[in-house]
């Protein structure tokens, strides 16, 4: 009876694929699911089996397109070597992972239990800790520390030999510096490893191959002379080991002088061939900056003894560089083909089942009557003001590296009172523009809608203001005046938002001047918010792009458009949080974060999910890197959460043009010519790809990623397959694991199987999605082994998670054939088998977490505002009203300020005067000297003395509607408030929360702390409660402050009160001096002042 009920629920679609074994079928049931967990695809399986300890192949280049799983393939290869090294009794070699993206590889290893470095339970615990740490909202919380500790423990397992680790992870720079240690003698002589080599062309800064063949000998000579010390520990670890180098094109790129490639070349060539480490190199674009990099690539890829005459290749062997351009020599490409045989894996996967469709907006352009291949552009004619500025560079301008902004925009020029004057031109040079704008008068800045963003340690000089707006005030020239390109970008963004949902990635290679920082200001000037700002009347809706004041749509709620930004000057932890939020499934449509602006830090190693639009504002050095930028958003399975009709990415490639083409278009034309030469080398490199016969890549016409290509395949009679090494080399174990995953997936489809039915289903090709190998070749012996390993026995319960149920597979003897039933487990982890087995949905008790630290903080320090308000009214009937600033926490003051502004509390005139005296609260009269800002609050009812805003530690909040309780935030500097006023030379006072109390603390001024050399971080004076200071120190401070009482008869508590009140009085006086909030001396930090960070930097 039980079996009859269960068998009646067999899966519908897909039944017939397996033959009669799958009848009867329920026509309404779901199809068989995809196999769960990580499954290596064919290309990954092939290279894993090709490059392993049991094959003779020493070096391999994974030339796979971006997003196809190079890192997983490299880890799979490394796992085979690790399994082999574990059999060594002593002196086992190491696996070195070197590259700028090594943390990405570590992350993959720790989030994929199928790779064998972590268990499923550890991954579940990692996800749990990640969730809790994210809820804490702080990278320094207890929860975040627990997460970091857990991750560190897992990482140590990879690198600690005592814990079974076989890996070493290095950045390229770190690896080179640790391999080549400059001695003190070498430092005295300013020795540089690169000095061992001459330069063939100083302008290109590339190595001379006439000397490169002797570099091992030269390094040995330098070591003998005491200039350098080669790290023998690293050399011994690499002897017979494995070297994985990610993004290999970075080690020999001519754009930047480095010794990364020399370090790799040295460790590969310093050993006899049979002791040299194996090597796996990875890159979607192995040659980038110059076609001549092929020489460096082949010298790394081909062992020395297999190169012509046993010597490194030289550039003159492959290239003719006699004229104005580089050309391939005759037979050079044939040599590349021959040398790359057996050493290159090529993968270009365009399967639309897994990858989003790539769509180019715009049109193809020509430069000087030559059509530019491959790329479509959004043509952006320069504005007249840009053209006038370009004329300053002459008739055929050569754009220097500090003049790159001319490609994008120009800035207002203080040389001209009005930018619309005849012959007026703008600024664009990165060395001149910041100085010129910084020295401009306040009147000129206001007249031209420019606001200076003062630089800080992590924020370089930048500008904002209405000159970046599409709709500026009538007397100000707006964005269209200064940039045709950015005007078009802004119009396209608004059009995309109006047309529907979809996330946008904006790329610019630069950070400063016309780079990502100004893009951030352009978005904000046109109604798009950053991650944290509150909406105001001009904020745009993420659904219809209307501004909030005009938002009349009844079919949807107003949701502000928001953006985030990633660049090298943002803390890594902040970048990771922003990226996680942008990629989150909850942000699929972009209503939490619609736009991400990224600099060149996003070109390699980062993945973006479900991006529908990519806007490229500048060329990233060369075309191969442009391909890398495309690959950030076109990745395998990157759009699987979107509906099928939305699995595409539209790419906007913006270029500024002039009537005769322009310098930016000329740059693209030159780089595309260079890229054609690189493509010819790529074609030769890939012709004999080791997996060409399995991937069956055939490219009929030129495309961005490849010239026409047909793999060179020579049919051969290989005879019968030799199976006697199948088990010995571990392939049988891999097959058992694969079959186990298939069996679990089948039990997700139906809970009861007979042995023959199950074997039939397992061996049926394409029955379950995600299996790329030929099921018909499975061994039934391995199937039986997999089934037994999953089945319940009384001695050991095999727990499985099937359809969200904690299950086991029960083996039930029956006639005529035994049954295998997926039975749920009860709380004792015993299988339950009855008539409801197939529908019972048992789940273990859900765990709930409480943030203890947050609870304690709230319960100990927060009192209801009403309680504090009543206490305030009672305490300050007779006390000096200024004392309110130091007796109540920031939460009370901010609530009070908003109540004063919104509700106009009666009887609070004295408190309002205190807030105004310390420049904490602002009336309409206070804002009137700033016309651009006054426009924001001019419509707010009330006379000149009406409060309209208050200062926080980061900004000034201005009321825009008392009824709706909406605010507009502006930077502090816009009201001439300098957050970094110079501290006095005596002592600094401030209040700090201790439980429900506020304690008065003092510390030395920051300039004194900087002068003192502190060798022990524990000795860094971060401040202390005044009463805990020594009596002598208290009296010294009081004397320096001019407190003229008889201090010997005053208690420590009274003395500290005198010091506190004195500092508060001096702070008020300093603020009320002319320009006091800009240049006044700092004595006391109030509740809304940001304290400088005190960290030990030595």
Swiss-Prot record:
Protein name per the record: Early transcription factor large subunit homolog
Lineage of the species this protein comes from: Viruses, Varidnaviria, Bamfordvirae, Nucleocytoviricota, Pokkesviricetes
Induction info: Expressed in the late phase of the viral replicative cycle.
E.C. numbers: 3.6.4.13
Reactions catalysed: ATP + H2O = ADP + phosphate + H(+)
GO cellular component: virion component
Assigned keywords, A-Z: ATP-binding, Helicase, Hydrolase, Late protein, Nucleotide-binding, Transcription, Transcription regulation, Virion
Species: African swine fever virus (isolate Tick/Malawi/Lil 20-1/1983)
Keyword Amino-acid biosynthesis (UniProt): no
Family: Belongs to the DEAD box helicase family. DEAH subfamily.
GO molecular function: ATP binding; ATP hydrolysis activity; RNA helicase activity
The organism's place on the tree of life at top rank: Viruses
Domain spans labelled Helicase C-terminal: 489-689
Xref: InterPro entries: Helicase_C-like, P-loop_NTPase
């Amino acid at each position: 009876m039980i079996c009859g009920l269960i068998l009646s629920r067999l899966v519908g679609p897909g039944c017939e694929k397996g033959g009669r074994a799958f009848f009867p079928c329920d026509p309404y049931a779901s199809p068989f699911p995809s196999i769960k967990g990580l499954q290596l695809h064919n290309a990954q399986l092939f290279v894993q089996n090709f490059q392993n300890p049991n094959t003779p192949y020493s070096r391999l280049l994974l030339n796979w397109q971006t997003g196809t799983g190079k890192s997983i393939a490299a880890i799979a290869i490394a796992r085979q070597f690790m399994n082999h090294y574990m059999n060594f009794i002593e002196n086992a070699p190491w696996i070195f992972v070197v590259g700028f993206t090594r943390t990405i590889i570590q992350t993959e290893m720790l989030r994929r239990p199928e790779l064998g470095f972590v268990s499923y339970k550890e991954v579940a615990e990692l996800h749990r800790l990640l969730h809790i740490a994210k809820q804490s909202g702080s990278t320094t919380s207890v929860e975040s520390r627990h997460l970091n500790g857990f991750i560190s423990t897992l990482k140590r397992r990879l690198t600690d030999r005592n814990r079974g680790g076989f890996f070493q992870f290095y950045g390229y720079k770190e690896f080179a510096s640790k391999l080549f240690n400059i001695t003190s003698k070498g430092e005295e002589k300013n020795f540089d490893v690169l000095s061992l080599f001459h330069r063939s062309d100083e302008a290109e800064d590339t190595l001379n191959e006439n000397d490169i063949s002797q570099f091992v000998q030269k390094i040995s000579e330098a070591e003998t002379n005491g200039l350098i010390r080669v790290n023998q520990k690293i050399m011994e670890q690499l002897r017979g080991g494995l070297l994985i180098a990610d993004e290999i094109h970075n080690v020999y790129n001519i754009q930047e002088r480095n010794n990364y490639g020399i370090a790799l070349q040295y460790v590969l060539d310093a050993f006899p061939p049979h002791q040299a480490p194996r090597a796996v190199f990875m890159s979607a674009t192995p040659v980038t900056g110059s076609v001549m990099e092929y020489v460096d690539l082949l010298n790394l890829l081909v062992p020395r003894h297999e190169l012509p005459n046993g010597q490194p290749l030289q550039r003159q062997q492959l290239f003719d560089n006699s004229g104005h351009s580089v050309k391939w020599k005759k037979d050079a490409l044939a040599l590349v083909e021959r040398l790359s045989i057996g050493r290159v894996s090529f993968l270009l996967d365009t399967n639309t089942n897994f990858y989003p469709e790539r769509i180019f907006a715009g049109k193809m352009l020509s430069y000087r009557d030559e059509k530019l291949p491959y790329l479509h552009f959004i043509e952006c004619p320069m504005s007249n003001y840009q053209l006038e500025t370009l004329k300053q560079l002459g008739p055929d301008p050569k754009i220097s590296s500090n003049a790159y902004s001319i490609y994008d925009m120009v800035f207002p020029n203080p040389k001209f009172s009005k930018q619309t004057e005849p012959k007026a031109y703008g600024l664009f040079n990165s060395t001149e523009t910041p100085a010129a704008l910084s020295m401009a008068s306040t009147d000129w800045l206001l007249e031209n809608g420019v606001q200076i963003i003062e630089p800080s340690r992590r924020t370089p000089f930048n500008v904002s203001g209405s000159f970046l707006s599409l709709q500026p005030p009538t007397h100000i020239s707006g964005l269209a005046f200064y940039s045709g390109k950015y005007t078009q970008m802004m119009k396209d963004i608004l059009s995309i938002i109006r047309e529907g949902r979809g996330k946008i990635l904006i790329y610019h290679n630069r950070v400063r001047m016309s780079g990502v920082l100004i893009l951030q200001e352009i978005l904000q000037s046109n109604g798009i918010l950053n991650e944290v700002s509150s909406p105001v009347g001009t904020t745009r809706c993420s659904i219809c792009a209307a501004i909030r004041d005009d938002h009349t749509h009844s079919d949807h709620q107003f949701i502000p458009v928001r953006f985030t930004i990633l660049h090298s000057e943002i803390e890594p932890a902040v970048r990771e949080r922003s990226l996680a939020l942008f990629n989150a499934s909850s942000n699929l449509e972009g209503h939490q974060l619609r736009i991400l602006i990224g600099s060149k830090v996003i070109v390699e190693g980062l993945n973006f999910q479900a991006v529908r639009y990519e806007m490229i504002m500048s060329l990233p050095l060369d075309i191969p890197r442009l391909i890398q930028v495309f690959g950030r958003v076109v990745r395998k399975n990157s759009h699987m959460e979107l509906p099928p009709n939305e699995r595409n990415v539209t790419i906007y490639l913006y270029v500024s043009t002039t009537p005769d083409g322009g310098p930016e278009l000329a740059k693209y034309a030159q780089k595309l010519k260079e890229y054609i030469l690189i493509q010819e080398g790529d074609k030769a490199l890939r012709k004999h790809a080791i997996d060409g016969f399995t991937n069956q890549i055939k490219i009929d016409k030129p495309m961005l990623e490849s010239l026409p290509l047909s793999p060179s395949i020579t049919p051969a009679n290989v005879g019968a397959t030799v199976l006697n090494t199948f088990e010995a080399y571990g392939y049988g174990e891999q097959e058992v694991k694969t079959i186990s995953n298939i069996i679990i997936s089948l039990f997700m489809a139906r809970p009861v199987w007979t042995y023959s039915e199950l074997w039939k289903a397992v061996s049926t090709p394409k029955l379950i999605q995600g299996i790329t190998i030929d099921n018909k070749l499975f061994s039934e012996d391995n199937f039986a082994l997999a089934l037994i390993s999953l089945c319940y026995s009384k001695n050991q319960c095999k727990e499985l998670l099937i359809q969200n149920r904690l299950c086991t597979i029960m083996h039930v003897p029956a006639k005529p054939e035994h049954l295998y039933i997926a039975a749920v487990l009860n709380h004792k982890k015993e299988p339950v088998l009855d008539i409801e087995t197939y529908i019972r949905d048992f789940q273990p008790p859900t765990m709930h977490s409480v943030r203890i630290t947050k609870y304690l903080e709230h319960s100990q320090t927060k009192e209801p505002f009403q309680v504090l308000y009543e206490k305030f009214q009672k305490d300050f009937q007779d006390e000096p009203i200024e004392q309110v600033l130091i007796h109540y926490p920031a939460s009370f003051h901010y609530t009070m300020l908003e109540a004063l502004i919104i509700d106009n509390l009666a009887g609070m005139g004295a408190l309002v005067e205190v807030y105004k005296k310390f420049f904490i609260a602002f009336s309409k009269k206070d804002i009137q000297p700033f016309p651009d800002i006054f426009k924001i609050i001019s419509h707010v009812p009330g006379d000149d003395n009406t409060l309209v805003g208050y200062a926080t530690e980061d900004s000034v909040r201005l009321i825009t509607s008392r009824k709706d309780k909406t605010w507009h935030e502006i930077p502090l500097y816009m009201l001439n408030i300098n957050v970094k006023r110079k501290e006095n030379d005596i002592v600094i006072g401030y209040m700090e929360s201790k439980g429900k109390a506020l304690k008065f603390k003092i510390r030395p001024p920051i300039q004194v702390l900087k002068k003192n050399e502190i060798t022990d971080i524990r000795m860094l004076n971060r401040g202390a409660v005044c009463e805990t200071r020594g009596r002598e120190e208290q009296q010294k401070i009081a004397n320096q402050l001019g407190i003229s009482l008889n201090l010997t008869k005053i208690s420590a508590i009274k003395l500290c009160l005198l010091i506190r009140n004195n500092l508060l009085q001096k702070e008020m006086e300093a603020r009320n001096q002319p320009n006091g909030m800009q240049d006044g001396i700092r004595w006391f930090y109030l509740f809304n002042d940001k304290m400088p960070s005190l960290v030990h930097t030595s």
